[in-house]
Amino acid sequence: MSWSFLTRLLEEIHNHSTFVGKIWLTVLIAFRIALTAVGGESIYYDEQSKFVCNTEQPGCENVCYDAFAPLSHVRFWVFQIILVATPSVMYLGYAIHKIAKMEHGEADKKAARSKPYAMRWKQHRALEETEEDHEEDPMMYPEMELESEKENKEQNQPKPKHDGRRRIREDGLMKIYVLQLLARTVFEVGFLIGQYFLYGFQVHPFYVCSRLPCPHKIDCFISRPTEKTIFLLIMYGVTGLCLLLNIWEMLHLGFGTIRDSLNSKRRELEDPGAYNYPFTWNTPSAPPGYNIAVKPDQIQYTELSNAKIAYKQNKANIAQEQQYGSHEENLPADLETLQREIKMVQERLDLAIQAYSHQNNPHGPREKKAKVGSKAGSNKSSASSKSGDGKNSVWI
């Protein structure tokens, strides 16, 4: 009998079962299949040919053997192995189909992406470089990364070790796994009870038969009864061991699920504020504790800037003097003098702006002349203000 096909199928179950399930599979292959294929056939190959009865009545010996063994021991154990392994094989087919479907869906999602790149944020330049260049660079900038490189990095990371129970739960196979485990347990109990009613716990050396067409009670003799009794007890022990492993696996799944739920609740109590807000894609920002300061652009010291400052100061002083003059009723002549001086200062300021806009000779004679004129105008205006109303004002 060739067991290679069933053995290959059961090896695939090893990849989708728990730690206890792997032990059960080892017992099934090493004891049941190996013992039945090697020891059972060699022990029971002559059970009917060596079954001898002390009668010459035709057909009596066959009828007595049928009464002694309604079903051959080897055929009974082969049928038991097939039925017990059937739920596991069905679970294997369902698991392979579902996992392949999940992998195909993930592959379609990856292929549907428009760009095979992954984006992550990286610091652009150091603070010292930005200060030297007097430029404000972005603190974080996106760096493109190939998906293949990202997958290689994920594959190189060590995966958490587990006994298969978490993998079954993550793949959504827990319900079907429990169902096949229950079916396997029911078959074990059924065959254990059937084996007891068919064969008992001992193979007797002789069997008394009184069936027709036997004329009277006759004695039939069995070959190697002690060896067959030992082998029968071994098969009882293997069946009981497999049944205990099934019960152990059910307890393992139940207590493991309870322990995982308690651990998850404990982690939620320890971290109450974790992940209480929805994830939003925010704009790039600096990491915590990262501060950057950019030096402001320094205003160049030029004569044009001095002229602008002088114009603003003179305008403020004139407004202040007009306010005081309105209350004290200053002479109209003083106002006319001030207006003429303001006009002269404004003309000189326009000349300075024109000279600066050309930028051919920023320190040329025109700027110097404008500078001297602005100083003379400011001195005259200050003198006139002193003679006008006696109020002190600062002129630039």
UniProtKB/Swiss-Prot annotation:
The chain crosses the membrane at residues 23-45, 76-95, 176-198, 229-248. Residues 46-75, 199-228 are extracellular. Residues 147-156 have a biased composition (Basic and acidic residues). Its main location: membrane. GO terms for biological process: cell-cell signaling. GO terms for molecular function: gap junction channel activity. Keywords: Cell junction, Cell membrane, Gap junction, Membrane, Transmembrane, Transmembrane helix. Coiled coil: none annotated. Residues 145-165, 355-396 are annotated as: Disordered. SMART domains: CNX (SM00037), Connexin_CCC (SM01089). The keyword Iron-sulfur does not apply. Residues 1-22, 96-175, 249-396 are cytoplasmic. Residues 373-396 have a biased composition (Low complexity). The keyword Membrane applies. It comes from the Eukaryota. It is a multi-pass membrane protein. It is found in: Cell membrane; Cell junction, Gap junction. Pfam families: Connexin. One of its GO terms (cellular component) is connexin complex. Belongs to the connexin family. Gamma-type subfamily. A connexon is composed of a hexamer of connexins. Interacts with CNST. One gap junction consists of a cluster of closely packed pairs of transmembrane channels, the connexons, through which materials of low MW diffuse from one cell to a neighboring cell. This is Gap junction gamma-1 protein. It comes from Canis lupus familiaris (Dog).
